[in-house]
Amino acid sequence: MQYIKTFLIFIFLIISKIVIAQDEEELLSARVLGIENAPIIIEEYASMSCGHCASFHIQTLPEIKKKYIDTGRAKLLFRDFPLDRTAMLGSMVTQCMNEKQFFPVLNRLFQKQPEWTQSEDILESIFKTLQPLGIEKPMLLSCLEDNETNKNRWKLLLAGRDYAAKQKGVDATPTFFVNGKKVEGRF
């Protein structure tokens, strides 16, 4: 009988570690720009309402993409780190997109950031911003409606942000890591 109890405790601990690992993996899930086996990994934590994050995506990322990502030398891991309600709305919209739509939508929101983040009607402004990309209003609204999928996405965004703050020391946006090492100062 003692052997069975020990065995069950052992199995429980193994399963718990697997679940924790899956949860951690889910918390750290990122959208990837570039090839999977690129030797240089640029990890970005950004907030959709952060002006410096927008500047990086508008001014710096195109050059990095041209020199490193498009040549297979690097890949970008984008991780949301929403700092406020406005950023969370932007994150909910981008995270709702499929792989093909994600980076065009993300880039468009960063390019037009002052317009939609400072609008009286943020949701309508996001819709107008994304309309040229073919994003229809019903699709946009479905990304924000009150359902289990969106509640889980919201919780995951917050949990991922909290995990990055506590476990990786992310305390501002944008924050970058290159091959796991935090880059201080301007990227």
Please state what every model-predicted region is.
Residues S47, L61, F127-F187:
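C-terminal cap of thioredoxin/glutaredoxin-like
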Residues M1-D84, N152-Q167:
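Extracytoplasmic thiol/disulfide redox context detector
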Residues E36-N37, R85, E120, P174, ...:
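Solvent-exposed, flexible loop/coil residues
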Residues L33-E36, E44, C96, T117, ...:
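Short N-terminal micro-motifs specific to bacterial/archaeal maturation
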Residues A46-M48, A54-Q131, E136:
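Structural alpha/beta surface segment adjacent to cysteine/selenocysteine redox centers
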Residues E36-P39, C50, R79, S91, ...:
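Residues at structural and domain junctions
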Residues A30, F78-F81, P114, L141, ...:
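Conserved short-loop catalytic and cofactor-binding motifs
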